[in-house]
Amino acid sequence: MKIRHLLNLTIGQDKGLMFSKDIKQLPTDTDFLYYILNYDINHEPGTHFVYNNAATYLLCAITQKITGQYFRDWIQKELFNEMGVTLGEWEKSWQGICLGASGLKLKNSDMHKIALLLLNNGTYEGKRLLNKEWISLMNTPQFFTANLPDYIKKQGRCINKMSYGFGLWICGNGTFEYPKTHYFCDGTDGQLLIVSPKDQMVITILSHQKDMNPIYDAIRYFFD
């Protein structure tokens, strides 16, 4: 298993782990690292995609081991201070490892700044903060995800999860029939960060809504 497999969620497990409902069912003193690393690997890493919060947790654990800092504190200092973004509380396991994929408190105005950083290929207000090639790699399809035409018909081109990059869903898969259009992050119950390079536009939404159809309808107004 390599860092690349953690980033594109192809670590080889048959199901995603570390979702909120899963965590609630585990004993409160569960060692999540032991739990993840001893869970069955059913596929060669890099060959099977499944959305999996465990991969992000492992990335946070590795970063904390290397830097000696809590992940939230490290990325705040190394990146977000330069942008005027303030990360709120970020939930951690009882071992002190940042959950990574969930539990972050963040204002919509700050999430919008992150979207602009992606749109501008790693620059913010004219200052280079991230490597342009890295941003390109993030939003390049690394793995195709489903029975694509049916999926598109169900949700519409503007918000389909046709492929996955590094930490980003990508609309389209880069083929002639389904060209890559925009890319996005999608959190539970309506947390969305959408980047459209073609339209030079970003959309960020923070909500708490089980029925996502009204939100999708509003997004289609801009993209369809």
Feature-to-residue mapping (PLM):
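Residues that flank catalytic or metal-binding motifs in active/ligand-binding sites
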Residues: K2, G100, K107, W134, ...
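Active-site-proximal binding-pocket segments
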Residues: Q76, F80-T140
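Structural recognition of the beta-strand scaffold that forms the well-ordered cores
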Residues: K2-N8, E89-W90, L116, I194, ...
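Active-site Gly/Thr loop motif
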Residues: V85-L87, N139-V202
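A short acidic/small-residue loop/turn micro-motif
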Residues: Q209-D211
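Active-site-adjacent helix/loop patches that line small-molecule binding or acyl-intermediate pockets
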Residues: M1-V85, N108-G122
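Solvent-exposed loop and edge beta-strand segments that line ligand/cofactor-binding
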Residues: E44-Y51, L99-K105, C185, D189
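Short, gly/Ser/Thr-rich active-site loops of penicillin-recognizing serine hydrolases
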Residues: N213-D224
